[in-house]
UniProtKB/Swiss-Prot annotation, chains A, B:
Entry keyword annotation includes Cell inner membrane: no
Function of the molecule: Regulates membrane-cell wall junctions and localized cell wall deposition. Required for establishment of the Casparian strip membrane domain (CSD) and the subsequent formation of Casparian strips, a cell wall modification of the root endodermis that determines an apoplastic barrier between the intraorganismal apoplasm and the extraorganismal apoplasm and prevents lateral diffusion.
Membrane topology, from the record: Multi-pass membrane protein
Sequence similarity: Belongs to the Casparian strip membrane proteins (CASP) family.
Name under which the protein is recorded: Casparian strip membrane protein 3
Keyword Aminoacyl-tRNA synthetase listed: no
PANTHER family in the cross-refs: CASP-LIKE PROTEIN (PTHR36488:SF11), CASP-LIKE PROTEIN 1U1 (PTHR36488)
NCBIfam families named in the record: A_tha_TIGR01569
Length: 197, 197
């Protein structure tokens, strides 16, 4: 008799156990996608600030040396180097895109299971990442050259003379690399959110 | 009586119509994902060849000028410029990754609805794209400098002397940009394949 009582008790417990578990797991899935979407929005705001800071820092990089000859004053500005000009333009485009992408990120929070905004975000984020990385890598190549020069090509470093210029440019490059890292993370989040399960 | 006959005939036709339509659409969906996966594999093979060509071209870029002084022979090699060294290493890593990713692409063809390999591919492809773009952009900044020099920083172009060197390096950069474009396309394909529908 104890066995008879036991077996129904067990199966009913199992049945009771599974039903709430499934409900809980679907609830958790929705919450998980929503959590990813909120995380996406927060990271995106951070990326906007970082990309804007990179563009603004590089865009205001110039230095005039305090001494001058009769005919010439020594001055270095970001637009002396085409790579730094490209950097400013590219980072400005990335910042603009990130601001415009905020509404889509909010839509993804409201409707965590909609794939349309996610798909749009992942594709455009990848393009923005490419642009951002190109700007950062090209600028770092030039900053390294300005810092160390290259003896083989007979290019001398200019950071001995224009120290502040180089420091500001380096800061902008670091900011753009951080923005690229955040964008890479955003793409991973979008890919996880696009998954079927 | 004609009305009685018409109505059942219509509904049965509708019922007959819907059932095969649903079956056909699920079949088309599977085929669409399989088609994307096959396209992915073909593009990936193309990217392997392009990335390898970029690495090999840059890695064999050197030029010795046919004249020399008593003490010095003029020579330019890719490893005189750290950016070009980085380019060779980065493109070799990208090629290696692309070769290793081929089995996952084949798994995605065999099981078009599995999200695991797709998710892995999209994340690692994004990392590879970042590396590839960084190498290409940094190299293009240096190639531009070698071609045109920069009067503000007093860096003179070296392509007047080392013409073949510059041409080979430019070719490698072009190949790496093509590889980056293919990788971008692969990510879009993976994102489309990851969609729920």
């Amino acid at each position: 008799m104890s066995a008879r009582v036991d077996i129904p008790a067990d199966t009913s417990a199992a049945a009771k156990g599974t039903a709430p578990l499934i409900a809980a797991s679907t609830h958790v899935k929705g919450g998980y996608k929503k959590g990813l979407a909120i995380f996406d929005l927060v990271l995106r705001l951070g990326a906007v600030v970082t990309a804007l800071a990179a563009a603004a820092t590089m865009g205001t990089t110039d230095q005039t040396l305090p001494f001058f000859t009769q005919f010439f004053q020594f001055q270095a500005s970001y637009d002396d180097l085409p790579t730094f000009q490209f950097f400013v333009i590219a980072m400005a485009i990335v910042s603009g895109y990130l601001v415009l992408s905020l509404p889509f990120s909010i839509v993804a929070i409201i409707r965590p299971h909609a794939t349309g905004p996610r798909l749009l975000l992942i594709i455009l984020d990848t393009v923005a990442l490419t642009l951002n990385t190109a700007a950062a890598a090209a600028a770092v190549a030039i900053v390294d050259l300005a810092q160390n020069g290259n003896s083989s090509a007979n290019w001398l470093g200019i950071c001995q003379q224009f120290g502040d210029f180089c420091q500001k440019a380096s800061g902008a490059v670091v900011a753009s690399f951080i923005a690229a890292g955040v964008l890479l993370f955003l793409i991973v989040i979008s890919a996880l959110a696009l998954r079927k399960r």
